[in-house]
A protein has these predicted regions:
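A short, well-ordered alpha-helix in the C-terminal region of glycosyltransferases
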Residues: 95, 102-116, 126
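Short alpha-helical segment that forms part of, or immediately flanks, the ligand-binding pocket
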Residues: 29, 47, 52-56, 70-72
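Nucleotide-activated donor-binding/catalytic signature segment of Leloir-type glycosyltransferases, i.e.
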Residues: 8-29
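Short hydrophobic beta-strand element within catalytic cores of glycosyltransferases
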Residues: 60-64
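Short acidic/histidine- and often glycine-rich active-site loop of Leloir-type glycosyltransferases
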Residues: 10-11, 52, 66-77, 81-82
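Aromatic "clamp/platform" in nucleotide-sugar-dependent glycosyltransferases that forms part
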Residues: 43
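C-terminal alpha-helical cap of glycosyltransferases
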Residues: 7, 120-133
Length: 133
């Protein structure tokens, strides 16, 4: 786990969960690049910067199906899986762990999705096209 704030880790999984707390930006990217995937379980995300950062690190994502924004990103980019309950979550994690080549390919696809859609020049062009400048 990465991020600020307190988290209560159940005793039965404490040995398997590492709470790194708040990290500086490079350590965050290094942790992301070395991970199996990034999990963004929120049901109430808008645009998720951390998902884009994960894809730039060539890692796939795992998001909650009830979050329209992040599950749409996962579907549109073909760079993530989504879950609705614990059993689907577990299945998705196992899929990534047992299929590292597919996970790596999904991460690369995610990186290209970010570069194709959210690089500064792409965003500026969208604004200019919108305003017909």
């Amino acid at each position: 786990l990465i991020g600020g704030g307190e988290v209560s880790i159940p005793d039965e999984i404490k040995e398997d969960v590492y709470d790194l707390g708040f990290l500086d930006i490079q350590d965050k990217y290094d942790a992301c690049a070395g991970s199996v995937c990034l999990c963004q379980p929120s049901k109430n995300e808008s645009f998720s910067i951390v998902i884009m950062e994960s894809w730039l690190c060539e890692r796939p994502v795992l998001v909650h199906k009830a979050c329209n924004v992040t599950s749409n990103f996962a579907k549109e980019s073909n760079s993530g899986l989504y879950f609705n309950d614990y059993f689907e979550f577990e299945g998705c994690v196992n899929y990534y762990v047992n299929n590292p080549d597919i996970a790596a390919a999904m991460g690369k696809t995610g990186r290209q999705f970010v570069l194709d859609n959210y690089k500064w020049d792409v965003i500026v062009k969208r604004f200019l096209d919108f305003f017909e400048v």
